């Protein structure tokens, strides 16, 4: 089929790569270049870089309602459009152009976790199961009818990166199957509990030792790679790069044990073992080395700004 693809981050690149191997990608649409790096120089998105490298037609419109963009989409004449983490709602003027509409690969069991951060929100909530949905877009936020759904348990140590990639890879399989049979398929309306998944804020990476160790571990897994988890020591931010919960008791926020493996901190329930950290302005290091270098010992209180 003639396919237009809408996507932006690195997560979406394998979706585009799989599509172009099975279908004719007549247009790639990504978000405009954004300032990146220390120099804040405008740089293309990962999807835009891939499209340029592969010689695919590429547009980076600031507004999808602009007539110039809509006309370019009409001229490309896609039979269907596919969306994977594009980052903007598609207006009706564009939705009506492909005869078979717009399909969206969404990493949740819709209607749960509609929005920008479904993988992260599922982990934060402690969900035991999630999945991926292939849906037809309408004007709402992930409200359209479903073509296919795949369910899976969330693995005990899976973070947002690993889970998101696993859901995407299965989603690609489902998407290709749907495209093969699209003219004969009828999507079904979403049913069940509706919830939303707004983008993460930087503050949501902060570890509050007043929560349980299990809840903190869920938070750590959910906020990878951004904003990452962190706490404060002597008023300075310390990134928590690797950690795990373990049995034990201790006062929340107070170091209970320092050993070769790491630094055990008390929480509301259980201990949180810090394995690798990165103090503000310094390199990453084993938590045991950080404790020696920064005077962290049993009884030290963490978390205070």
Swiss-Prot record:
Keyword line: Protein biosynthesis, Transferase
Chemical reaction(s) catalysed: L-methionyl-tRNA(fMet) + (6R)-10-formyltetrahydrofolate = N-formyl-L-methionyl-tRNA(fMet) + (6S)-5,6,7,8-tetrahydrofolate + H(+)
Domain of life: Bacteria
Cellular component, GO annotation: cytosol
Pfam families noted in UniProt: Formyl_trans_C (PF02911), Formyl_trans_N (PF00551)
Binding positions for (6S)-5,6,7,8-tetrahydrofolate per the UniProt entry: 108-111
Record-listed E.C. numbers: 2.1.2.9
GO MF terms, alphabetically ordered: methionyl-tRNA formyltransferase activity
CDD domains, alphabetized: FMT_core_Met-tRNA-FMT_N, Met_tRNA_FMT_C
Gene3D superfamilies per record: 3.40.50.12230
Broad class of enzyme this protein falls into: transferase
SUPFAM superfamilies hit by this protein: FMT C-terminal domain-like (SSF50486), Formyltransferase (SSF53328)
Function statement: Attaches a formyl group to the free amino group of methionyl-tRNA(fMet). The formyl group appears to play a dual role in the initiator identity of N-formylmethionyl-tRNA by promoting its recognition by IF2 and preventing the misappropriation of this tRNA by the elongation apparatus.
PANTHER family, alphabetized: METHIONYL-TRNA FORMYLTRANSFERASE (PTHR11138), METHIONYL-TRNA FORMYLTRANSFERASE, MITOCHONDRIAL (PTHR11138:SF5)
Family (UniProt): Belongs to the Fmt family.
Protein name as catalogued: Methionyl-tRNA formyltransferase
Species, as recorded: Thermus thermophilus
Protein's gene: fmt
């Amino acid at each position: 089929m003639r396919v237009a693809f809408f996507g932006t981050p690195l997560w979406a690149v394998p979706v585009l790569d799989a599509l172009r191997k099975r279908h004719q990608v007549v247009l790639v649409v990504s978000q405009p270049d954004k300032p990146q790096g220390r120099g804040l120089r405008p740089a293309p998105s990962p999807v835009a870089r891939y499209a340029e490298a592969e010689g695919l037609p590429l547009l980076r419109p600031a507004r999808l309602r602009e007539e110039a963009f809509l006309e370019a989409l009409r001229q490309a004449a896609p039979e269907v459009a596919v969306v994977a983490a594009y980052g903007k709602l598609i207006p009706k003027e564009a939705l009506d152009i492909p005869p078979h509409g717009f399909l969206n690969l969404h990493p949740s069991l819709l209607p749960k976790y509609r929005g920008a951060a479904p993988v992260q929100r599922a982990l934060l909530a402690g969900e035991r199961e999630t999945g991926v949905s292939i849906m037809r877009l309408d004007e709402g936020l992930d409200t359209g009818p479903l073509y296919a759904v795949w369910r899976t348990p969330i693995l005990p140590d899976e973070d947002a990166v690993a889970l998101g990639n696993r859901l995407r890879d299965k989603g690609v399989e489902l998407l290709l199957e749907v495209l093969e049979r699209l003219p004969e398929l009828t999507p079904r309306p979403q049913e069940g509990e509706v919830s939303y998944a707004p983008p993460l804020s930087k503050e949501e990476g902060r570890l509050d030792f007043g929560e349980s160790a299990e809840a903190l571990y869920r938070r750590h897994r959910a906020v990878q790679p951004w904003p990452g988890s962190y706490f404060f020591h002597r008023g300075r931010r310390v990134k928590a790069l690797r950690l795990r919960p373990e049995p034990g008791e201790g006062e929340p926020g107070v170091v209970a044990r320092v050993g070769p493996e790491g630094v055990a901190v008390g929480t509301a329930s259980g201990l949180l073992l810090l394995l690798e950290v990165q103090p503000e302005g310094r390199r990453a290091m084993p938590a045991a080395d950080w404790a020696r270098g920064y005077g962290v010992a049993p009884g030290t209180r963490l978390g205070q700004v």
